[in-house]
Curated annotation (Swiss-Prot):
Record's cofactor remark: Binds 2 magnesium or manganese ions per subunit.
InterPro entries with a match to the protein in the record: PP2C (IPR015655), PP2C_BS (IPR000222), PPM-type-like_dom_sf (IPR036457), PPM-type_phosphatase-like_dom (IPR001932)
GO molecular function: metal ion binding; protein serine/threonine phosphatase activity
Origin organism lineage: Eukaryota, Viridiplantae, Streptophyta, Embryophyta, Tracheophyta
Enzyme Commission number: 3.1.3.16
Compositional bias (Low complexity): 438-455
Top-level EC class: hydrolase
Cofactors: Mg(2+); Mn(2+)
Compositional bias segments (type: Basic and acidic residues): 28-39, 499-517
Keywords from the named record: Hydrolase, Magnesium, Manganese, Metal-binding, Protein phosphatase
Taxonomic source organism: Oryza sativa subsp. japonica
The protein's name in its UniProt record: Probable protein phosphatase 2C 20
Entry binding sites for Mn(2+) 2: D105, E323, D364
Catalytic activity: O-phospho-L-seryl-[protein] + H2O = L-seryl-[protein] + phosphate; O-phospho-L-threonyl-[protein] + H2O = L-threonyl-[protein] + phosphate
Length: 517
């Protein structure tokens, strides 16, 4: 029996509805094709027709401010096949002048990063140490995210809510009725994960926690200071942990071909699907299954580095961004561009979008949070006490953050400092203890050692050398050089008349043997 409907002929069985079997499938395909043809301006049609030949340069930008800080966040998919970055920016987290900012760079999918963006700050606020010990609460929040991902798939309902979030409860009821049948065992996301770089501003204190290669950079009077260190398998400490956990790391490098960065050789793990270029992340449980090791010693660990410091009025802004930005710009490049544009009077929204655009050649998604400290909202820098005799030898750059009270916590690497260019110590244990860093002196094993700045004109020890200031002769000897043992009497030097004079001006020749520092 044939029925005419419009200009299309279709077969209808006399015993059933008009759209059954193949006819229903054909109609659905035809409708999808018509909808695609009407969506001529949509990005989905563009990607289906062009693949990855064109980047997605549309940006999501948001900004808010209070009487102390202003923030702008912007994100762009770029050349990535899909958007796997996520972020959270909360100006008022509670009633105690607390702000929260976080960027999460996902890999293997966007679900873990999206879950972190929606849940991390909640886990932080719910911790018992949130009011008394914010550093400990932040560290526990990293581990809580991993635990939530391992327990069940309920976290996916928060990422992709279906039917107002009640799908999980409907599924639980249906599964209960099917209890006689064997139930599938939940498997944690093996190859899905995310980095995390979070910043909490409470009062005049700044707390930074990170795991992975997302980065936080501070601008102080136009100078860049890294508040986080990338966790890469090519670093000595991270490689040692990876190998001790049974993994094998290989190298990576990039090469620019036709304006795009292409991976030539990549650091990763031989048993990791697709390989990742980071050594710490949330998720990625395929590399966290060594039952003989604690979580902080796994091949991939979520154990974060924590930095605590005081905010002073010489701090201008923070830049918190995913790897897409840092692949193309150094810390100082980002600070210089932002600093110059602010002096030109450019809006913070425009500057943040420019930084995101700079991440386009990386071939990855890019997310940037720009946090501006308002002038006069934070205390001034306290003056340095110069009354003691040793103050002339103190290196003002000992503190990696430049403040008078900074705390750095590193749980795995004694050389993994908060600022690679500073002489800051770090804790080499996994207990979460923090290392105090003072702007006027640094303890390095004894009370008689201080950090001395370089003075090439006078022949002083090199920058950062350790010197002993307690010798009875009043001299300072570098511990990095081969010197005779200390004597109780002052050293003797020959008279100038006893030295051989071979130069016309009758001046004594240079002799390192009698070099006084």
């Amino acid at each position: 029996m044939w029925v005419m409907q419009g200009e299309r002929r279709r077969a209808r069985a006399p015993w059933g509805p008009p759209d059954t079997g193949g006819a229903l499938l054909e109609r659905w395909i035809s409708r999808e094709r018509r909808s695609d043809s009407r969506d001529a301006s949509g990005s989905a049609k563009q990607r289906s027709a062009m693949g990855n030949s064109l980047p997605v340069e549309s940006k999501f930008t948001d900004e808010k401010e209070n009487d102390r800080i202003k923030y702008v966040v912007s994100s762009m998919q770029g050349w990535g096949e899909k958007m796997e970055d996520a972020h959270a920016a909360i100006l008022n987290l509670d009633d105690t002048m607390t702000s929260f900012f976080g960027v999460y760079d996902g890999h293997g999918g966007a679900e873990v990063a999206s879950y972190c963006a929606k849940r991390f700050h909640i886990e932080l606020c719910n911790h018992e140490d949130y009011d008394s010990n914010l550093s400990n609460a932040m560290r526990s929040a990293f581990y809580s995210m991993d635990e939530d991902l391992q327990l069940s798939d309920a976290w996916r309902e928060l990422v992709i809510p279906r039917n107002n979030g009640w799908m999980y409860f409907i599924k639980a009821g249906v599964c209960a009725n099917l209890s006689p049948f064997p139930q599938a065992t939940y498997t944690a996301p093996s190859y899905e994960g995310s980095t995390a770089c979070v910043v909490v501003i409470r009062g005049d204190q700044l707390i930074v926690g990170h795991a992975g290669d997302s980065r936080c950079v501070l601008s102080r009077n136009g100078q860049a200071s890294a508040l986080s260190v990338d966790h890469k398998p090519d670093s000595e400490s991270e490689r040692e942990r990876v190998q001790n956990a049974g993994g094998v790391a290989v190298g990576y490098s990039y090469r620019k071909i036709m304006g795009r960065w292409v991976t030539k050789k990549q650091w990763g793990f031989t048993d990791f699907k697709g390989r990742v270029s980071i050594s710490r992340s949330i998720g990625d449980f395929a590399c966290k299954k060594n039952e003989r090791l604690p979580p902080e010693d796994q091949m991939l660990t979520c154990n974060p580095d924590i930095l605590t410091m005081d905010i002073t009025d010489d701090m201008e802004f923070l830049v918190i961004a995913t790897e897409g930005l840092w692949c193309n710009m150094t810390n100082q490049n980002v600070v210089d561009h932002t600093h110059d544009r602010l002096l030109e009077g450019a809006e913070a929204r425009v500057i943040c979008e420019e930084l995101v655009q700079f991440g386009l050649p990386s071939g990855d998604n890019t997310t940037v949070i720009l946090v501006l400290f308002k002038p006069g909202a934070f205390p001034a820098v306290p003056p340095v006490d110069t009354d003691t005799d040793t103050d002339s030898h103190i290196d003002d750059d000992v503190d990696p953050t430049g403040s008078n009270n900074a705390t750095a916590s590193d749980n795995n690497d004694p050389a993994n400092e908060v600022d690679p260019t500073a002489n800051a110590g770090s804790d080499d244990s996994n207990t979460g203890d923090e290392v105090k860093v003072d702007a006027t002196a640094t303890a390095v094993g004894s009370s008689s050692t201080t950090a001395v700045a370089a003075d090439e004109g006078t022949g002083n020890p090199p920058h950062g050398a350790l010197v002993d200031t307690d010798d009875e002769d009043g001299l300072t000897y570098s511990q990095d050089m081969d010197l005779p043992p200390a004597s109780t009497s002052p050293p003797t030097f020959p008279d100038e008349d006893d030295l051989p004079r071979s130069n016309p001006d009758k001046s004594p020749p240079h002799d390192d043997t009698y070099h006084r520092w």
